[in-house]
Every structure is written in C-alpha cells, then in structure tokens.
C-alpha cells in the first residue's frame, strides 16, 4: 500500500468513526460486564441473577432495534453526520444517568434509552467511511473501524475492575461527550450530498420491503449475522453460568467479554484482509460461519479444567464470529445511496435485537434440557440460518457505491 493510500485510509472520517465505535462498544458491553455487581447492589438474589439479566438485556436490545430504524432513516434523510452527533449525545447522557439508578425497572428504562442511542453509531460510521474511501480501500477502512472499536470491550473490563459499576457508567458517558467535540471537524459524505441535491426519495424504510429483490437482500444481510449475537448475547453474557455448569470456578463475565472481543477484533482483521485477498465478501463469511460452528461446539463441550482454559475458549468464540465488520460492510454495499444508511444502521441492530427471541428460545429449552444442551441447539439453529441466508445476498466486493435504489 503506497503513502497516498495510507493517508486516505487514516483520514479524519475513518479515525472519528473508529473512535466512535470504540466508545459505542464500551457502553454497549458494559452492562454484560457489570451485570452481577450492579444487580447485587440493588438487592437481587443470586438465584434471580440470570432471569433479571435476561430482562435487562432484552430492554437494551429492544432499544437497539427501535433506534436502528430511527437513526437509519435519519442518516438517509438528514445526512450521516446528524446521526453521528445525535446518537452519541443520547447514549452518553443515558449512561451517565444509568450510574444513578437504584431499582431494576429504572435500570431497564435506562438500558432501553441507551440502546436507542447506541444503535446509530456503527451504521452511520461504516456508511460514511464506505462512501468516503475509494473502492480498493473500502474493506480496509471498515475493518480498521471495527477492529479499533471492538477494543472498547478491553477498556470497559479494565474500568469495571478499577472502579465500581456506577463510576464505570459515568466514565462511558464522559468519553462519549468528549468524542462529540471531536466530530466538529468531520465533513459529510460527498456521495450523499450529490443525492441530496437531486431531491430523490431518501430513507424510505418501506422501500426495503416493497420489492422482493430488495427484501431478500435485506433479510439475507440480517440473518448472516445471527451467530455473532448468539455468541455475544448468550454464550459470553452468561459465561459465569456456563462455567458453573462445566464445574469451573472463578469465571468473571468481564474477563470473558474482554477475551472474546480480543478474538473478535483479531477475527475482524483476518476476515477483512482475507476478503481483500480473495476479492470476495461471501466466500470469507462462509469460512467464518463454518469456524463459528466448530468453536461454539468446542466452547460448550471441550473439557476445560481451569478458568484460563475457559477464557481461551471465549477468545476462539470471538475469533469465529469475527466477521462483524464484513457483515456491516456487506449491508452498506448491497443498497443505493438513498437507502444505504437505513440498511447499514438497521441491519446490525436488527441482529442485535435477535438476542430477544434467542434468549426466549434458550430459556424455553432450559426448562427441559441442561444449559449446555439448550445453548447448543440454539447455536446450531443460528448457524443453519446463516448458511441459508448467505445465498440471498449479492457479491459486492468491487461494486461502485454511487447509485440509487429506484422502484421504476
């Protein structure tokens, strides 16, 4: 890569999007890390910890689902920058207030509001980066954003170990407000501004559903990511419960999140560079879905003896589902400029929202099976759906993004 390409790759939109996603991941995963100490401080019994945790993560995920639609439409109607400013302000303030809650219901309300705010960050950032970089660098740019962003999980774990859970939320909110100031120097996407001048219909959410070819691609984009949030939302979030079922003591959710996200960041680097090398998004995703199946089975049934061995399993879980950046890039590349933000923002949040039915399915199966068997059935289900969904999307590696979605 020559010096000109490197300069384009490390441009202000890419750096700001990467730092924004870093704070977004910190705030998004902080709940998984501080779930047990925060609920304990509110008087929740250990026997209720899993059920109350599922209630709170559902509230956050429903917020993400709703926020994905709101911010996605806004990104196409008002511009990518409006989302980058509005979303970070909402989730930063929500997280600061979250540090003051005293009841589980207050906690749920704040996770819901924070979820709405968190929904806008990644889609708007990836859309802006995809439209700002030349085709040959697009995959590298989105990979850089995701890899830097995912390391926010490492910071969240460090902060949660160093401070109490309330201060961890205050710090997350403060980081977001600081980042808000840095966004003043970012310019709007040139591709979007050209479309805005043309006066075409933009951000029409229903356009994703009114033609079979678009709807098919939209559903395919969502469902290829199903294993990613099954791993994060169930296997990692409830890792202390899985470790207990395996007879392993001393597993801390924060460490499980950290190691899985280090794996996820490594996977994103590998999948990003692999897709550039083989010049195919779909072939790379196929390989990583296959790896996910192997690592999910190993995590649940490998005879781990120690917590360090268990954390190694968490790392490989993350590595297997390390096609998150590719997943969001594919969503951005499938659709025209007038629908790109809507698609790229709703797709990752719809898949995050899939944690809601997946946790219900997991809970239902736990009533008649043990926790490991229930998790394996849900996991195999997500893998099968993802393989099928891969057939519904286009190969977009070399696609020029300067085009529109039209109904006529």
Model-identified regions with their sequence ranges:
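Extracellular/periplasmic helix-loop-helix junction of adjacent transmembrane segments
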Residues: 34-66
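Helix-loop-helix hairpin linking two adjacent transmembrane segments in secondary transporters
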Residues: 145-184
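Helix-breaking motifs and short loop linkers at transmembrane-helix boundaries and internal kinks
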Residues: 79, 100-106, 134, 279, ...
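Cytoplasmic membrane-interface "Motif A"-like loop-to-helix N-cap segments
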Residues: 77-87, 136, 277-289
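Conserved MFS/SLC helix-loop-helix module at the cytosolic interface between two early adjacent transmembrane helices
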Residues: 66-102
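Helix-to-loop junctions at the C-terminal end of transmembrane segments
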Residues: 68-79, 268-280
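Extracytoplasmic gate region of multi-pass secondary transporters
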Residues: 32, 214-265, 355, 359
């Amino acid at each position: 890569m020559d010096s000109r390409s490197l300069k384009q790759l490390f441009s202000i939109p890419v750096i700001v999007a990467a730092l924004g996603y870093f704070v977004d991941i910190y705030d998004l995963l902080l709940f998984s890390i501080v779930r047990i100490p925060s609920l304990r401080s509110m008087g929740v019994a250990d026997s209720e910890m899993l059920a109350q945790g599922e209630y709170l993560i559902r509230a956050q995920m429903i917020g993400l689902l709703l926020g994905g639609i709101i911010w996605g439409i806004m990104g196409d109607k008002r511009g990518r920058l409006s989302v980058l400013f509005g979303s970070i302000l909402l989730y930063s303030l929500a997280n600061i207030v979250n540090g003051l809650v005293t009841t589980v219901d207050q906690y749920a309300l704040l996770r819901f509001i924070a979820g709405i705010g968190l929904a806008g960050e990644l889609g708007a950032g990836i859309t802006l980066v995809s439209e700002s970089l030349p085709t040959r660098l697009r995959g590298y740019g989105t990979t850089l954003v995701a890899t830097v962003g995912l390391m926010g999980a490492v910071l969240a774990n460090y902060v949660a170990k160093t401070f109490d859970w309330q201060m961890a939320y205050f710090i997350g909110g403060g980081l977001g407000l600081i980042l808000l100031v840095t966004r003043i120097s970012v310019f709007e996407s040139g591709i979007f501004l050209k479309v805005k001048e043309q006066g075409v219909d933009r951000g029409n959410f229903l356009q994703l559903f009114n033609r079979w070819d678009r709807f098919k691609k939209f559903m395919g984009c969502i469902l290829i990511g199903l294993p990613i949030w099954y791993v994060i939302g169930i296997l990692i979030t409830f890792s202390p419960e899985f470790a207990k079922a395996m007879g392993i003591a001393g597993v801390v959710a924060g460490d499980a999140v950290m190691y899985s996200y280090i794996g996820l960041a490594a996977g994103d680097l590998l999948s990003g560079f692999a897709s550039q090398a083989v010049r195919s998004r779909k072939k790379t995703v196929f390989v990583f879905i296959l790896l996910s199946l192997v690592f999910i089975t190993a995590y649940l049934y490998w005879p781990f003896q120690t917590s360090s061995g268990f954390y190694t399993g968490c790392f490989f879980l993350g590595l297997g589902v390390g096609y998150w950046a590719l997943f969001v890039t594919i969503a951005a590349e499938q659709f025209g400029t007038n629908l790109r933000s809507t698609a790229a923002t709703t797709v990752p949040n719809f898949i995050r929202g899939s944690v809601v039915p997946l946790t219900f399915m997991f809970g239902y199966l736990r009533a008649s099976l043990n926790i490991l068997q229930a998790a394996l059935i849900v996991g195999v289900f997500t893998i099968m759906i993802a393989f099928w969904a891969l057939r519904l999307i286009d190969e977009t590696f070399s696609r020029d993004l300067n085009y529109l979605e039209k109904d006529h």
